[in-house]
Structures are given as structure tokens and as C-alpha cells.
Amino acid sequence: MVNRKLSIVWDEEAFNNFQSAYQYIKKESLQSAKKVKREIIIAVRKIAIHPLSHPPDKFKIHNTGRYRAFEIHSYRIAYKISEKEILILRFRHVKREPLNY
């Protein structure tokens, strides 16, 4: 793995789920929604610099270590590490049924 900042690319469905979560939280509190959104964005930016900082994704079948995941504010973010980018594959609430992939 090269020691440089990788670009972040969101899968369309993952990004839509992130936006939906923001809108859902915003119904109750704009301030809370902004805080959660900001902290998630910061966490995602950090993996561009330190992609191996989170454990391998336990829901990825035959994971070679390139698929990783972490939880923040009750949301689970799964991503794939490639040579040039981090692909955000999934964004879901932790109470939703996990899917193997």
C-alpha cells in the first residue's frame, strides 16, 4: 500500500443512503444532523490518509483485507481500498440487517 492520500469515491446508493440519513436526523434537529454529517465526512476523509485504520469487513465474503468497515453515530460504513482510491460501498444504520457481499 502506497503512503499517500487516496481519493474518495462514493457508490451512488451509499451516498443516497448517507443523504437520506441526514434528512431523517434533520427532521428532529438541524444541529444534530449537521454534527453527524460533519463527523462522518471527517471520518471518511481520514481513511483516505490511513485506509488500514479500520478492521476488515466481517460481512465481506472471501475478504482479502481490501474491504474494511467502521461504525460512527450508529451508522456502518463499508469501503474498498484500491491503489488509487477508497470506494465507499455501503452506508447503513447498524440496526438494519447486514448483508453479506
Predicted segment positions?
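Basic/aromatic recognition patch in beta-strand/loop cores that engages polyanionic ligands
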Residues: H50, H54-K84
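Solvent-exposed interaction patches of small proteins and small membrane subunits
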Residues: E28, K34-R38, P55-N63, L99-N100
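Hydrophobic alpha-helical segments of small multi-pass membrane proteins
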Residues: E39-I42, R68
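Structural signal for well-ordered, non-membrane alpha-helices
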Residues: Y22, I41-A48
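Short, flexible helix/strand-to-coil boundary loops that buttress conserved ligand/catalytic motifs
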Residues: Y22, P51, R92
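Enriched for short, Lys/Arg-rich terminal
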Residues: M1, I72-R76, K80-Y101
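Generic structural signal for secondary-structure transition and capping sites
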Residues: L30, R45, I49-S53, Y75, ...
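Arg/Lys-rich, positively charged N-terminal/basic patches that mediate binding to nucleic acids
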Residues: M1-E39
